[in-house]
Amino acid sequence: MKESFTAIDFETANYQSNSACQLGIAVVDNGQIISQKSWFIKPPTKIFTFSYLHGITYATVKDQPTFGDIWPQVKPYVTGEIVAAHNADFDLGVLTATLAHYRMYVPDFYVIDSLAVARRTWPHLKNHKLSTVAAHLNIELNHHEAASDAKACAEIILHAGQQHIEINRVINKSLPESMDLFGGIY
């Protein structure tokens, strides 16, 4: 499964981890982004503290499906796969909390954090926020739009592969040694 993974990004309504209001994914196969998808999600709250960031309000999502409704569409991209996210602790925390809210189990998957990849690959940057790294790499980004953020995450990882970094050193320790994302150092 060389250079194949799914990048994800969540937007949340507020500080509650289970308040996902948008999910975006970018699917990478053989080093190419082959598809992008985005879902608006009706969270279990009407409190939208972060509308100023992403522009999503309760009115935007009140008639949208819940995460429990869209999970069957998303699950195949996650289960047993490599999942990438920028600042993965946040997005995986949202995924875990949201699945728990709907009493669904968290499937097994492997994690790569494009934030860690960026820090290792481009240590000279002033910071490694998604917007900073994307600007450095001339990646088009509509920040805080989940599909755009997921695509930027995927592109950061692919650029890092082109920069001759040994990605296995930044992939979650649970990744088996035989599952080498980029075939070692180029």
State each model region's role.
Residues 1-109, 123-124, 130-144:
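Conserved non-catalytic scaffold segment of RNase H-like nuclease domains
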Residues 94, 116, 152-154:
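Hydrophobic side chains within alpha-helical segments
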